[in-house]
């Protein structure tokens, strides 16, 4: 058997002498007892046992192979170099191998005494061992990583003493120091960082502070101080942000409360009259006149004594003026009229009409009924103070003038004015309508004649129209005013 890859041949024949008895003795069956086998072995002659064979010497050959590959041996091994005599035994084999199994262990103390060392064996070297390469991949055992000693750090201390003003070595200087001190770059950087930290703690810092380099960390104290400063800045920013958020939330809350207050002021009013106070606000003289006239003259003199509302006060709600105050005042007058007798009949009759006829009166009823007391004062045309016939003298309000007023204040005109006042918003009413009606006394006659000529109301009105036409020449009037009044009133007569 040969090993050409190892560079030397090797014979596989046994190199130890043995006898047949020895083989038979070693290979006896296990059925025999221990005492019998011991007695048989002692009776025979000593023999050489085949302890080492070729396969048992592979480890030794492998170690020597690495030595041969490294050039320790100049030529391949042969059997003539004494490799076969690697382990030799003396003539007496019982001194090395005792066949007595019950022999004491003291006899083995001289077992290795008779084994001489061969000339081919060399002293142990760690480079020839099984783990001959260290972790850095080099054969030099002196370059292995080890702890820094005073001898190695003396070079670093000398360099630090020379560079006290700038104890920050560059990359090249670190490599040079690592080669000189046989240390790694990490060890050199760590040593310099610790040295700077130690000098700073001892207040021996002779260099200006600098920012962190890319290849090393700053001292621990500098990092702590900067972290504290950053934390304080962050805390200040958080506090300022919190204060701003609180102010914004407070402003939003105040805004919401103000909106709620406005909403309450608008929505929580229970009375409609309070909401419409700007439209209702007017002097109370008209109501006082209405109450006094209703008591004294059966609501007839309201036409003459009612003040003319100016153009700025046309926005008041006529529904409130006509119905609600009138009904309330007439209720008060009914209580007072029990003592005054017949003076309260007109107001009581007016209250009955308002209670019995809440709807709009029909044209047929208004055309057939000419009794002035059946209608409230709001349905009568407000004229008198500005008309020349009523303002001339107190005698002008006599029978002919009363007849003319009654016929001029016919239900059609009163109904028209009342509908315009109730169902039209004050913003859509022109301020010249009531002025035109009060500045002339013949506006109704002209309007009535025009309507009769067109044939729209000929059937419903009949005799009162003829009476008005017959009395028209007796009434002094101004044609210019009449024409202007007709244009102004006609444009607003039947507004939808």
UniProtKB/Swiss-Prot annotation:
Xref: InterPro entries: HD, Homeobox_CS, Homeodomain-like_sf, Iroquois_homeo, KN_HD
Biased amino acid composition, Acidic residues: 221-231
Keywords recorded for this protein, A-Z: Developmental protein, Differentiation, DNA-binding, Homeobox, Neurogenesis, Nucleus, Transcription, Transcription regulation
Main location: nucleus
GO terms, molecular function: DNA binding; DNA-binding transcription factor activity, RNA polymerase II-specific
Tissue and organ distribution: Expressed in the neural plate in overlapping patterns with other irx members, which all share an anterior border of expression. Broadly expressed in the tailbud rhombencephalon (hindbrain). Outside the nervous system and at tailbud stages, expressed in the developing otic vesicle, branchial arches and prospective heart region.
Region of interest: Disordered: 203-236
Pfam family for this entry, one: Homeobox_KN
Signal sequence bounds: none
Any single GO BP term: proximal/distal pattern formation
GO terms for cellular component: nucleus
Cell compartment(s), UniProt: Nucleus
DNA-binding residues (ranges): 141-203
Family: Belongs to the TALE/IRO homeobox family.
Its job: Acts partially redundantly with other irx members in neural patterning. Required for formation of the posterior forebrain, midbrain, hindbrain, and to a lesser extent, spinal cord. Patterns the neuroectoderm in both the anterior/posterior and dorsal/ventral axes. Does not appear to play a role in pronephros kidney development.
Protein name per UniProt: Iroquois-class homeodomain protein irx-4
Organism: Xenopus tropicalis
